[in-house]
Every structure is written in C-alpha cells, then in structure tokens.
C-alpha cells in the first residue's frame, strides 16, 4: 500500500481510495483536511455535496466540530495573508493561487456547514428512505407522542381488534391471558411484554392457523375411526382409572376428561382437542409411577401422539412468539417497517438493488462529489452492498475514501466482519490502496516498543481466502518525550493474586501522580469487562471511577432503584411501593424492620413527596443520600450506582419539572434509549483527580498518558485468536507515554486463554508471557522492563485527605399519619365489659385454624382470584393450593373452597339493593386499594380489601376471618353487631367510607358509599356472616394526638 500524506500535493484526493489508518495516525485530522483540500482544489464545490459516515452519533458530532474548527482556523490564516500578515497555509497550495477566491470558498463552507451530510450508517439509510422512498417510512406519526407511546398505541389497537384470531386459536390466547394476568402482582401484562419484545427477532413460532386447523382435522378423522371399536363410556372409564398410574398433580382433571372425550366422539372437529394441558401434563411420561399399567384407551391416544401434540399446542413461548410475529407485521404495515435500526439497512439494500431504484441511485451519485466512510472495518455485508452499489460504480464520478483499520475491528458481536472489509479492499487497484504511516500519539520510544511487539506477529491477521494482513511499523512523529525511571516505555509487572495486581496498579498510579505530575484523570486501567473492573475497584486505595459508554441500564440496578424511589415518593400511602425501595440496596432493611416501622417510613416518604414538588428530583435524591449514602456505598457497586443515579436524576429534571412526568419517562427510558442515543447516559468521568477504569471496547478512539492493561490478562471464552490479538492491539495503542502490562506468576498450565497468552502462542518463540517479558527486556532494555512481585511491597498507602465538605438540608417537620390500627388502642379502652372473648371459644378440627397466618393466607387468596373465573372450580382449587402448599392450611383445601364459594355466591343485602359478588363486573373492581387523605389537618391511611361499582352504586367490602363459633347461626346479624361494636369495626368503616368519598369527589361523584363486612367462616345464603354498616352512624369522640406513638398495622 502507498503512503498517504494529505499535505503532499503528489498525493491526489480525486478518485476512489481505500485508506488504512492505524491507531494514532491522525485519521480524524486527515478526514477534516480532505474536506478542506477538496474545497480549496475545487473538486468539492459546496459542502452540501460532501457526505461523511461514521460509526456513532458521538463520532459524527466530533467530526463536525473538527471540520468546523479546521475551516475557521484556515479562514483566519487566509485572512492574515490577505492582510499581508504572517500565516501558515497548507503546503499543497499553489504559490500563485487566488487567495481571495479560496477565502470566499472557505468562508461560504463554514457558514453553510450544517448543510453537509454527516450521518451514522443508520442515519444515512433513514435519510435516503425518507427522501426517496417516503411510502416506506412512518405511515402514522403523532409529534405529541414518543416512539414508544406510538408503538404502545398500535399494540393496544391490535389487541382491541382481536387480530390475534388470525394466528392463534381462542384456547391458546386464553393461556396467554392467564399467564400475563394484569391483576397479578407477580407478572407483567401482555401489553407490557409485547412492548418490551417487539423488536426481537423470532425463530420459533407456529405455522399458519389454517394449516394447523387442517392438521387437527386430519388427526381427528384418523383417531375417530379408531374410536368406533371402543364405547364412549368405556373409553372415559379407562382414562379415569388410568390416572392412578401417574404422579398426583395439584389439580383435578375429571371434568376435563369428560369434556375431552365428548369432543373426541363428536364427528365435528374442534381446535380445543389439543387444549387440555392438564390432562396432557398428568399423563406425561415423566410422571409415570412403578404401578403404571397400559390401557386400550390411552394406547389409542399414545399412538396418535396426543400428549406431545397437546404440549406443543399449549407451549406458551411458541404461542407468544406467534402472536409477536403477527404483531410485528401489523406494526410494519400500520406504523413503520423499521422496528429496529438495522431493519432500515436491510430495507435500503433491498430497495437499491431493484430496477425501480435506479433513478434514486443516480440522484445520490449526482448529489455527492466527496464521500468519506469512516470506521470501515466495522462494516457488514449489507452496509458494503449499499456503498458499493452507490459509489464504487464508475458511474459515480466523485471522490470516495473508505477509511478503516482491520487491526481495530473488535466489534464482531455487532455483525462487523473482516471478510467484508477485505472484499471491499480487493475491489481497489493497488495504486488506490493507501495507508497513513506516521504516528502522532505515542512518544517515539513507546511507538518503537509497540512496533517491536506487533511486528513479531507475521502475518498479523490471516483470513482464509484473502491475502494476509501484515503489521506495518509506524513512524513516530510526536515531539514529546517521557522518562520514567526505573521503567522503560513498556513495563511488565508480575503479580500473584488479583489483589496484588490491583495494589501494584494503584500504587504506581499514585507514584506517577506525585513524581511525574501526571493527573490521575489522564491515566486509565483497561479491563475486559465490568466484573473485572468491580473486582479491581474493591481493592482501590486511591479515587477511581468506572467509565463506560453504555446505557445506565446495562450493568447496574440504577434504573430499578431510581424508579422504585420515585414511585415510593409519589405514592407514600402504598405499602407495596414503599416496601420495594426499603428492601433494596438503597435502604437494605429486613422484613421485620419494614413491618415494625412501616408507619414511620410512610411519614418519611410523605415528607419527600412535599419536598420533591418544591425542589426537584436531584435535590430530593441528595436529601435521601444524607441518611442512606452509607448504606448504598457499603453495597456492591454502590459508588457507581450513586454516580449513575445522580446523573439520571439530573437528566430527568431537564426533561420535566413534574415528578409524575419524570416517572412516566423513566419507565419507558430503557426501551426508548435503544432509539435515541442522546438518552444514553455515560458515566465517563472528567475528574482529573480520579483514576479511570474502562473496558477495552469503550476505550477505542480514546488516548491517555498512562495505560494499565489488566484486560489483556483476563481469560476469554468464545473469542477467536484473531479477535484476541486485535483487542490487545487496541489496548496497547491507547497509550501516549507509558504502557503497563501485567503477567501472572501462575504456571502456564494453570493459565486460561487470554489476549496475552494468545499473543505468546502466535509469537511462537517463547513458552510463556514470563519468558517473553524477560526476552524483550534482554533484547531491548531501553524499550522494555519488568518487575517481580517482591519489587513492590504490600504496604498500604495512607492518604491524608482533607475532610469532605458536607451540607445539610432543612428538615421538613413530618406529619403524623393515623390509621384505624393506630387509633384502635384508645378505642379499645371504651370496650363494653360484657364483651365476648371470642379467641377463647373452642374450635373443632374441621374448622380453619385460628391465628394471624390463616387470615393473611385467606386474604392473599381472595386478592389473587379472578372474578371472571369464579365459576371454574378447578381454577379456584389450583389458586388455593398455590398459596397454602407447605403451610399450616395444607389439608384444608376443600374447606377453603366451600367458604370461598359461599363468599362469592351468597346474596349480600345492602340498603340500596341485594346481589352477590359473582354478579359484579370484573372491570369495575379495585382490590387492595391504598389510601391517604387529609382530614382536619390530620393524615389518615389504610388499605381497602374490595371497592367496586355495581349498577351505578358504590360499595366497600372488608374481609374478616374472625372466629365467632362453630355454626353459621353464631354469625347472625345480632352477634355480628355486638362483635363489630366490640372491635370498633364501625369506626374502621367510617374511615374507609370517607376515603372512598374523597376519591369519588375527584370525579365530581357525590353518590353514597356503602360498606359491608363479610365474615368468611360464617357466611351463607340465609344472611348470616354478612353485616352492612350504617353509614350515618356517628364517629366516637377521641383525641388522635394522644396516641401518636401507636404503630399502624394492616
């Protein structure tokens, strides 16, 4: 390849060139000079005819700034010449050139630089599609909505129209609906799951619904003929008896068996033949017992693979994938074909290869006179197809530069591949293959050492089917020198343990800071991944920060913690949201601590609720950190999480001043971050007093005075020898003055494959990295040095750091929050002396056990039951078993089922009407509803078991598992009245009714609210076990301030 020098007038820039730019050779400088030279020489008449494509948005912005600064500097020099002042102009300028004309050309370019086409590859593809193929772009776009909100809108529309029926059977969709049950606290909704997954590629899904229905019909016809020999009742009896040969399941299949056999013996085919998952799971081969005996009925099913077909039919992953594929097609047709950025690349490649695109191809060729494609080593086949189609053709008369370095191709996981790079290179003649040969980054001695290391590998890279890639030594051009006795420019240090390695690095960094006056911020520790970074940080003796260019959602729980904190602040009355953040690493509390201090924390978050509305999210975060900072910093990665939460809170404050808007944005952040690069928050530290730690991949394109490379010693899995060598090259070429390479003292047989051990193997003359270091030092003592573990002590450096400046935030006086639980103590002092001690009543073994645990479990069951499935006995039983398995209630399943059936189907008589809970519409029900309201300057909180609307009236239900006696008559209205007054439940009811009325008033609803108490142990169809409270009853007089120290329990 020919050397290329932009300032050499003999190095032409007109034509098509393949330019290799090794690390530190001034690639970006060369690109900006190519643009300037093209303007000066006239091959580029206007900057709007220039196209530059880079890898990331950050690179695009940097290049634009560099080009702008270069044009501005050149303009100043030209102006100086016009004013007959000393000036420095490019050497390729002809001495007799028209300086005034060039001045006007550069000034015009600077003023109109925004018209230059500067894109990432995805940006370029989107630009072409929008300009020339508008029909393939967004079909519907509402500027008031974000991309995520638009996708959510279309997902909702898809489901509302029941379009799933085109690809799924009703039984399959029912399985999905149960799996993604929105009333469950443990699962996400189907809509949320689809929103989180809509960009994912899908490989495993069902064939078309029509095809599957044909297969079901054919299957049924075949088995129907076999069934003619077995009477229906005999078939059913055999299958029923067959159950005993399998392991017992936590559900009954008797009703399903009757239904299944009915369908089998019907001549008409039903898709639900394969929907009996419980039968298939019961008769699964893996559940067979030793006493299993075959039967004729099951043999028929077995021969027709019914169990296998049913398990496949009910496979939730395939059902979801099938739905997702159809949804993706719907989004492409109704919103945008480009569900992910890469799809725009695929689409443009396909469109440009069609005959109808030739006018577009011609228009693009005519639009651009200069095309610069940077980081070409990271290009894939589709991208190269686009570029070659547009600009390699002789019909493109402008200039083209493909610029890259195969030695720095470390993004194979992003689809970049070297064969594509080499294919592109081979399409250029040898005289058009250029290279930058001068290094401006590293000191001459360090560059000489780097040349020595990589010059030993020949060929540097070898790809089957292509000419080998050689390492070409670079000419050092830096005028800077650096002396660092006793170390040579590349220093190998040996270590025994990771702790030894970390302490050596931190000790050496501190020495360089003191003796060489190099700020810690100009040094970097390059690691393989975040785990290695955090391990090193755990031994840090100096200030360090892990700098990464990833989204904050990539490694830590920052997103989760920030969301949980904001939800707790905005909903201080919601115990579940408060508990979530209290259990997290931000507070680190135990279950007992949260339970006993729940009211205190509600008061605390209520004070933060007021604070955030006046001071913003970031200030509120700092306020929380004044008490919780030590807890967070003592947790793994706590310092990094603090930095990220700080940055995220500050970012959200710039988005909106309304906390609820911030929470909405935060919940959609992780998904939208994939589309909007400006939303990705980098934790890259600019602090000069902090040693940086970053990954080798993140360091690409950056440079540092001092580089420590423990990342090349970390074992790597599933990486090719070629990629390991390229990673080592990238790591070593980040250094400007000094490079440190660690070597483990473990025997080679115990060392796993790493970039360094891979290098030793490729170099071939030494048996270990240890031997290599010794050999290099003996061969070039002025370039390489080494130190053994004994050369440094393990003395811990004691830093005399100044005391941290702290600040205190004004504490807002908290309000006491009252509840029925906290006031009950005082109310109990008014109890009637004739009250009945129900807790001492005898209880038979047939009754549910007494105690708080029983009440909690029954409440959990009632909380989770879907009202739409109350008629489904098997569903109710499976729900009950799910909660009571391995508890003290195991064995009471039938008793609980009977009690629940009575609870939901017994008539409840209120003053306005009589009805059962089974008649209430599921979509008009709120369960476990938390409230917090202000009454007479006092805050009241609580949780309502059930709140619903029925036929235009509003009702509250409170569940009670209190034991009043063995018979239903013990739960008569007269007995309940005594118990309710005794336990002050009428007082509790008044609090709940007040809370609901305040809630309804927000919607200008002034209707009355009635409250009923259901005693689950005694409810029946005769009116026992239910008591409707009189809402007009007066509240007993009391002074809540007298009981402020009482805790609230629910």
Swiss-Prot record:
Tell me, what is one Gene Ontology molecular-function annotation carried by this entry?
A: ATP hydrolysis activity
* Pfam families, per database record: UvrD-helicase, UvrD_C
Relay the cofactor remark from the entry. Answer: Binds 1 Mg(2+) ion per subunit.
The UniProt record lists the UvrD-like helicase ATP-binding domain at 1-443
> Key word Ligase present in the record?
no
Q: What is its EC number?
A: 3.1.11.5, 5.6.2.4
- Do you know which InterPro entries this protein is assigned to? DNA_helicase_UvrD-like_C, DNA_helicase_UvrD/REP, P-loop_NTPase, PDDEXK-like_dom_sf, RecB, Restrct_endonuc-II-like, UvrD-like_ATP-bd
Q: Where does Mg(2+) bind?
A: 859, 945, 958
| Alphabetical keyword list | ATP-binding, DNA damage, DNA repair, DNA-binding, Exonuclease, Helicase, Hydrolase, Isomerase, Magnesium, Metal-binding, Nuclease, Nucleotide-binding
Q: Where is the active site?
A: 958
Please describe what this protein does.
Answer: A helicase/nuclease that prepares dsDNA breaks (DSB) for recombinational DNA repair. Binds to DSBs and unwinds DNA via a highly rapid and processive ATP-dependent bidirectional helicase activity. Unwinds dsDNA until it encounters a Chi (crossover hotspot instigator) sequence from the 3' direction. Cuts ssDNA a few nucleotides 3' to the Chi site. The properties and activities of the enzyme are changed at Chi. The Chi-altered holoenzyme produces a long 3'-ssDNA overhang and facilitates RecA-binding to the ssDNA for homologous DNA recombination and repair.
Extra facts? In the RecBCD complex, RecB has a slow 3'-5' helicase, an exonuclease activity and loads RecA onto ssDNA, RecD has a fast 5'-3' helicase activity, while RecC stimulates the ATPase and processivity of the RecB helicase and contributes to recognition of the Chi site.
Assembly, in brief, is: Heterotrimer of RecB, RecC and RecD. All subunits contribute to DNA-binding. Interacts with RecA.
Query: What name does the UniProt record give this protein?
Result: RecBCD enzyme subunit RecB
| Record organism | Chlamydia pneumoniae (Chlamydophila pneumoniae)
Question: Which lineage do the record's taxonomy fields give for this organism?
Answer: Bacteria, Pseudomonadati, Chlamydiota, Chlamydiia, Chlamydiales
Q: Which gene encodes it?
A: recB
């Amino acid at each position: 390849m020919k050397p290329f020098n932009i300032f050499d007038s003999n190095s032409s820039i007109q034509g098509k060139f393949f330019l290799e730019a090794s690390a530190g050779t001034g690639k970006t400088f060369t690109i900006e000079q190519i643009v300037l030279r093209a303007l000066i020489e006239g091959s580029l008449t206007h900057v709007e005819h220039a196209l530059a494509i880079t890898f990331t948005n950050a690179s695009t912005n940097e290049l634009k700034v560099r080009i702008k600064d270069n044009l501005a500097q050149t303009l100043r020099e030209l102006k100086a010449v016009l004013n007959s002042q000393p000036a420095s102009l490019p050497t390729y300028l002809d001495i007799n050139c028209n300086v005034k004309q060039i001045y006007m050309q550069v000034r015009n370019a600077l003023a109109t630089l925004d018209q230059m086409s500067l894109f990432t590859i995805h940006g370029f593809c989107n630009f072409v599609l929008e300009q020339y193929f508008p029909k393939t772009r967004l079909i519907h776009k509402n500027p008031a909505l974000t991309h995520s909100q638009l996708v959510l809108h279309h997902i909702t529309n898809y489901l509302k129209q029941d379009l799933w029926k085109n690809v799924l059977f009703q039984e399959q969709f029912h399985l999905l609906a149960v799996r993604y049950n929105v009333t469950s606290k443990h699962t996400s909704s189907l809509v949320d799951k689809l929103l989180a997954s809509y960009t994912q590629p899908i490989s495993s899904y069902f064939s078309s619904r029509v095809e599957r229905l044909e297969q079901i019909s054919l299957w049924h016809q075949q088995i129907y003929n076999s069934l003619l020999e077995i009477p229906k009742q005999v078939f059913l009896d055999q299958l029923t008896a067959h159950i005993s040969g399998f392991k017992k399941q936590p559900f009954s299949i008797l009703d399903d068996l009757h239904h299944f056999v009915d369908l089998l013996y019907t001549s008409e085919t039903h898709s639900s033949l394969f929907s009996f998952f419980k039968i298939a799971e019961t008769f699964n081969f893996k559940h067979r017992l030793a006493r299993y005996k075959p039967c004729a009925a099951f043999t028929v099913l077995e021969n027709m693979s019914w169990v296998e077909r049913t398990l496949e039919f009910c496979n939730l992953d395939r059902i979801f994938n099938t739905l997702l594929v159809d949804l993706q097609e719907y989004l492409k047709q109704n919103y945008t074909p480009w569900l992910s950025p890469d799809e725009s690349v695929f689409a443009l490649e396909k469109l440009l290869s069609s005959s109808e695109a030739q006018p577009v191809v011609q228009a693009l060729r005519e639009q651009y006179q200069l095309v610069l494609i940077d980081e070409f080593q990271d290009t894939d086949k589709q991208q190269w197809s686009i570029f070659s189609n547009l600009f390699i053709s002789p019909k493109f008369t402008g200039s083209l530069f493909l610029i890259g370095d195969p030695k720095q191709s470390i993004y194979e996981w992003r689809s970049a591949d070297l064969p594509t790079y080499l294919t592109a290179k081979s399409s250029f003649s040898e005289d058009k293959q250029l290279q930058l040969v001068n290094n401006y980054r590293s000191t001459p001695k360090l560059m000489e050492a780097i040349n020595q290391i990589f010059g030993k590998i020949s060929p540097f890279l070898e790809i089957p089917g292509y000419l080998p890639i050689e390492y070409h030594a670079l000419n050092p051009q830096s005028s800077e020198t650096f002396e660092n006795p006793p170390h040579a420019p590349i220093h190998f240090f040996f270590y025994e343990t990771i702790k030894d390695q970390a302490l050596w690095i931190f000790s050496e960094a501190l020495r360089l800071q003191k003796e060489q006056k190099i700020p810690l911020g100009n040094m970097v520790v390059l690691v393989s991944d975040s785990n290695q970074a955090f391990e090193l940080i755990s031994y840090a003796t100096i200030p360090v920060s892990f700098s990464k260019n990833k989204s904050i959602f990539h490694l830590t729980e920052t997103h989760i913690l920030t969301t949980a904190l904001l939800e707790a602040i905005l909903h201080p009355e919601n115990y579940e949201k408060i508990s979530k953040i209290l259990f997290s690493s931000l507070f680190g509390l135990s279950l007992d601590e949260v339970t006993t201090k729940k009211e205190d924390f509600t008061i605390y978050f209520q004070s933060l609720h007021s604070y955030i509305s006046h001071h913003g999210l970031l200030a509120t975060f700092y306020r929380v950190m004044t008490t919780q900072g030590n807890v967070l910093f003592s947790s793994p990665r706590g310092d990094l999480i603090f930095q990220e939460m700080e940055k995220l809170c500050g970012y959200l404050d710039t988005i909106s001043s309304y906390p609820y808007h911030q929470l909405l944005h935060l919940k959609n952040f992780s998904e939208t971050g994939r589309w909007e690069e400006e939303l990705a928050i980098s934790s890259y530290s600019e602090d000069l007093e902090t040693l940086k730690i970053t990954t080798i991949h993140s360091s690409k394109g950056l440079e540092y005075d001092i580089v420590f490379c423990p990342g090349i010693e970390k074992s790597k899995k599933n990486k090719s020898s070629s990629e390991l060598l390229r990673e080592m090259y990238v790591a070593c070429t980040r250094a400007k003055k000094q490079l440190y390479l660690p070597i483990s003292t473990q025997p080679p047989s115990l060392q796993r494959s790493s970039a360094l051990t891979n290098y030793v193997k490729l170099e071939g003359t030494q048996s270990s990295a240890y031997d290599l270091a010794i050999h290099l030092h003996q061969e070039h003592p002025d370039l390489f040095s080494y130190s053994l573990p004994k050369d440094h002590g393990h003395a811990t450096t004691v830093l005399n750091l100044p005391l941290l400046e702290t600040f205190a935030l004004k504490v807002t006086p908290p309000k006491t929050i009252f509840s029925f639980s906290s006031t009950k103590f005082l109310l109990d002092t008014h109890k009637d002396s004739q009250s009945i001690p129900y807790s001492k009543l005898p209880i038979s073994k047939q009754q549910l056990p007494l105690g708080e645990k029983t009440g909690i479990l029954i409440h959990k069951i009632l909380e989770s039951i879907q009202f739409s499935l109350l008629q489904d006995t098997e569903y109710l039983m499976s729900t009950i078993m799910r909660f009571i398995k391995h508890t003290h209630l195991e064995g009471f399943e039938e008793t609980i089922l009977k009690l629940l059936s009575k609870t939901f189907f017994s008539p409840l008589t209120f003053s306005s009407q009589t009805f059962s809970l089974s008649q209430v519409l599921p979509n008009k029900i709120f369960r476990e509803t938390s409230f917090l309201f202000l009454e007479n300057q006092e805050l009241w909180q609580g949780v309502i078991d059930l709140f619903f609307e029925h036929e235009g009236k509003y009702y509250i239900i409170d569940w009670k598992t209190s034991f009043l006696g063995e018979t239903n008559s013990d739960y008569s209205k007269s007995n309940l009245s005594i118990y309710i007054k005794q336990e002050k439940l009428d007082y509790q009811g008044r609090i709940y009714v007040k809370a609901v009325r305040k809630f309804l008033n927000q919607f200008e609803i002034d209707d009355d609210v009635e409250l009923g108490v259901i005693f689950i142990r005694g409810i029946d169809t005769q009116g026992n076990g239910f008591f409707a409270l009189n809402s007009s009853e007066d509240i007993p007089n009391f002074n809540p301030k007298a009981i402020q120290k009482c805790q609230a329990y629910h």
